[in-house]
Amino acid sequence: MKQILDFIPLIIFFALYKMYDIYTATGALIVASAVQIILTYFIYKKVEKMQVITFLMVAVFGGMTIFLHDDNFIKWKVTIVYALFAIGLTVSHIMGKSAIKGMLGKEITLPDSIWGKINWAWTLFFTLCAILNVYVAFNLPLDVWVNFKVFGLLIATFAFTLLTGVYIYKHLPKDQHLPKDKHQQRDQETQNDTQQELSGKNTEEK
């Protein structure tokens, strides 16, 4: 559900660009992003910082695009958002904290060295996306950039997320690789051993 909410503003932006122009599409993107934030809050009772940053950038640079009738602002918005993400991850690492670990560490147990590598990998990914957007936005036709923004970056992010998932799985502690029934079996065996020990102690006391 959350992924669908994240994708809807992009689809609306793409559809209205094809039907009308970049300025109509940008206005719709601002409204759709605001609605997305509201729905996310009411459904999940919280909004991620990345979503808030993205919305603020859409509102500011989208508004400037419409007010000044200059699509360069909405193009720069993409690069600035990715650059901010990269800077945020870099700062968190310098401060001795992995932002990625902060998001996933409650559900996944990994050594800090692995979290650090994942943090740097996403820093590099966001940096490359920021640079690539500049090239596509200012060297290729607007139609190409819109397709790149909506589909190219989305597919790249999805693929990199999958690669991150594979990397995390390879470094999970062995007990986290066990299926649920194996966990239950192990817990039952531990419980039985504990009961036997307690029974033995009770026998000795008697």
UniProtKB/Swiss-Prot annotation:
It is a multi-pass membrane protein. Its main location: membrane. It comes from Vibrio atlanticus (strain LGP32). The chain crosses the membrane at residues 22-42, 50-70, 76-96, 118-138, 148-168. Plays a role in cell envelope biogenesis, maintenance of cell envelope integrity and membrane homeostasis. Pfam families: IspA. Belongs to the YciB family. It is found in: Cell inner membrane. Residues 178-206 are annotated as: Disordered. Residues 191-206 have a biased composition (Polar residues). Keywords: Cell inner membrane, Cell membrane, Membrane, Transmembrane, Transmembrane helix. GO terms for cellular component: plasma membrane. Residues 178-189 have a biased composition (Basic and acidic residues). This is Inner membrane-spanning protein YciB. InterPro entries: YciB.
